[in-house]
């Protein structure tokens, strides 16, 4: 992290150990975010599972340091629009990194509207 800071440029440093090694206990000394879960899958049961696991460590997050339940699956086609809305809201309420995981060149207008929801982004 110190080497990245010396560049003088803002850099978001994300750690990924797939939720192992109790990364939520030490991640904020090294990075800005750390994965608390296994890879998310493009299905509702995976979204809920990752949210519940991520929610076990709220004390680890703070300004400039976030628990990361993995990227957003909004726009990838495996969720209904209601599930996509819920997925985005859960990540926003959890203060999770809102990392878009779909192809923005092909995403539907409805899914893009979810990703651009200013109210949820403001909560996040």
Regions found by a protein language model. Give the residues of each.
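Alpha-helical scaffolding within the catalytic cores
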Residues: 1-3
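Glycan-recognition surfaces
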Residues: 5, 9-103
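Glycan-recognition and catalytic regions of carbohydrate-active enzymes
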Residues: 68, 99-124
């Amino acid at each position: 992290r110190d080497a990245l800071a010396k560049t003088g440029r803002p850099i978001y440093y994300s750690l990924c150990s797939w939720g192992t090694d109790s990364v939520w206990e030490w991640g904020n000394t090294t990075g800005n975010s750390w994965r608390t879960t296994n890879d998310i899958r493009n299905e509702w049961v995976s979204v809920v599972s990752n949210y519940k696991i991520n929610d076990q460590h709220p004390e680890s997050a703070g300004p400039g340091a976030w628990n990361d339940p993995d990227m957003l699956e909004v726009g990838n086609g495996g969720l209904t629009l209601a599930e996509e809305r819920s997925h985005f809201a859960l990540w926003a309420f959890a203060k999770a990194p809102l990392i878009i995981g779909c192809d923005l060149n092909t995403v539907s207008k409805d899914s893009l509207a979810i990703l651009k929801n200013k109210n949820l982004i403001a909560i996040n």
